[in-house]
Amino acid sequence: GLGDVYKRQSLEKYTNGFLNSYTPSSGDVTRGDGNPIVRNITLIPGWTIEQFAEQLVKDGVLTDSAEFLSLCKSGTSFSEFYSVQDVLNSRNVSQRRYVLEGYLAPDTYEIYIGATASEIIRKLITQTERVFSVACEDRAEEMGYTMDEILTLASMIEKEASKADFTKVSAVFHNRLKAGMKLQSDVTIHYITGVRKMSLTGSDLALDSLYNTYQVTGLPLGPICAPSADAINAALYPDETFVAENYLYFCATSPESTELHFSRTLQEHEQAVAIYAPLWQQYDKERGIE
């Protein structure tokens, strides 16, 4: 596998403490009686729609996640957005876990108490279309990719690497796509299983799914998380040196580190894997992951 990085960036840093247990002082706008009208909600890059839903319930903006998840699954209520319409018209759309996966932008939002699931979703898609600007669309077109394909690539980059390596991982993926190689990205397996395992088994790799990049050639069926603007940018502008030098492989290093090891040849890659694989197996074992 190309490896997976266990991100160590502390959420606290990213969220400025918005995820802390709710108190009226946590940046809420209140009425005269001290009750909040608006709540600040932080949704983290790399989270899935299910994690977004969980957070919205935890923050007391939604009473439960069922309606939110069902709207995100079908996406049909949001076809007025050009980006969503394109997905709804795409092949195998019925097999996407959530049509809107990757289309709800991670950010900190002011959300009215009493906002409906549908209103919240609209706000998040609007932000995605703002982040994926006309310049992004032009660049994607120049590269021969659709917005959906770039969001898919960006979502994989988001899950595979820390920000420092985004453009390098992007270069490896672009090089593999160009060479007609399978992407073989572990994070696409994690999306199917819901388990972040460092050392994948043969049965993991054989999972029958259009998201499984060990099985499908090219990109997975759709995005696997909500990518940050940085990951989108990396998908559009891969590291030029790594593209030119045709890097085709990367793997995780020590499980405690976000550092990746990049290789040009399979031989170099296999040498790196031989060094680090025992550490990954140990890491999974200590966490009771089979």
Please annotate each region the language model reported.
Residues 1-6:
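Short, small-residue-biased leader/transition segments that mark boundaries at the very start
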Residues 7-15, 34-39, 154, 170:
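Ser/Thr/Pro/Gly-biased, low-complexity, turn-/loop-rich segments
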Residues 10-26:
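Intrinsic, low-complexity N-terminal interaction/targeting segments
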Residues 13, 74-76:
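Active-site "lid/cap" and pocket-lining segments within catalytic core domains
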Residues 31-62, 71, 139-145:
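Glycine-rich loop/hinge motif
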Residues 57, 61-62, 76-290:
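Bacterial extracytoplasmic/cell-wall-associated proteins, especially those involved in peptidoglycan
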Residues 65:
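Extracytoplasmic cell-surface/polysaccharide-interacting catalytic and binding patches
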Residues 68-74:
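Short, glycine-/polar-rich solvent-exposed loops and beta-turns at beta-strand/coil boundaries
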